[in-house]
Amino acid sequence: MELRNMNEAEAFKSVLNSCTGSVWMVSTLTGRHYDMKNEHDQLLSMGKMLSGNGRDMEIYADTRADQSRIMNFMVEQMAA
C-alpha cells in the first residue's frame, strides 16, 4: 500500500482512528508488525508508504466494519 502525499496520509490516519477494533500492518519483507492504533507505529508505517516503500505492507483489521472502512479508503484513493 502506498500513499502519494500528506493529504492522503492524513485521510488514512483519520480512517484508522475511526476504526473500533485492532488494525495492523505487516511488512512482507521483514515480518515486522505495525499497530496502526499506535501513533508511533502509524508514523513509521506511513513514512514507508509515503517514501514508495509501502508495496511490501499488508493491512489487516479485526472487524468487518473496519475492513470495509479501510477498503473504501483504498478504492477512493485509487480512483483519485
Q: Where does each model-flagged region fall?
A:
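Compact, glycine-rich, soluble single-domain proteins
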Residues: 2-28, 33, 40-41, 47-49
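Generic alpha-helical scaffold signal
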Residues: 6, 36, 61-64
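Short, well-ordered secondary-structure micro-motifs
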Residues: 36-37, 70
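C-terminal structural segments of small proteins and small subunits
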Residues: 50-80
